[in-house]
């Protein structure tokens, strides 16, 4: 129906609703690239609507156009700020402001742009101060947990250890748990194995307090943190010398990642295959590492199209 409208009615290409709907229709399809033109048009069609400026990036991220993902979401955020000055910060549109900055983090990380990712993460935190989180904690709190993923993506191990656990661990229950995960991974990579094991224990205690009601869009925080646990245990075991055990945990993390409910951006910000591929290379398992990276890049079509990350620098570097 939508494609018929675009084929038969030239005015459809200036209809924001049709363009918006088509992008959402195609983002889970085998051919998201069909909506690239629609996104390009929508980006400039209503320049004062931040969400519509952002919308094309739902397709860009699936097609490996990560520079557009970053630049368009930063532009959308600029528009959002203008609306915030007009309408204030305490309204439903706060979620859209968070979403655009959250998306910008993904674009920056896939590009390998550390400074841009850290900047977007810092700005995202500014959008979710305590008073905002308290309005809808089951939705808003998980945005605060974005920063540790950026630190891990860029191997900022010393900086991770210096991160403070939240004072209000009930309000920031997901963030508290994820920070223990990050610190365990950091210590494992720094060779501080005893500290890593202690953080694993702290993670388990914190994880037990996470309620089923806490979500990151379509996925429960508990499911996302269950994936984090496998990643954490995999890194800790591997760096301790238990390579087989570690790799098996990471393979389980990949399985859990593949079975999370679809959303954009993805609930787990750093593709699990990147860590698995890197440690497989370190272990000399070159054939499996190649297969892991090829799957992540979508070169072998083994993964559903929305689960592929074409042209990302991390998997390309590993494959090279």
What feature does the model see in each segment?
Residues 25-26, 60, 108, 151, ...:
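Residue at a conserved register position within TPR or TPR-like alpha-solenoid repeats
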Residues 6-11, 40-48, 78-79, 86-91, ...:
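Solenoid-like repeat scaffolds
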Residues 31-32, 66, 114, 157, ...:
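TPR-repeat structural position
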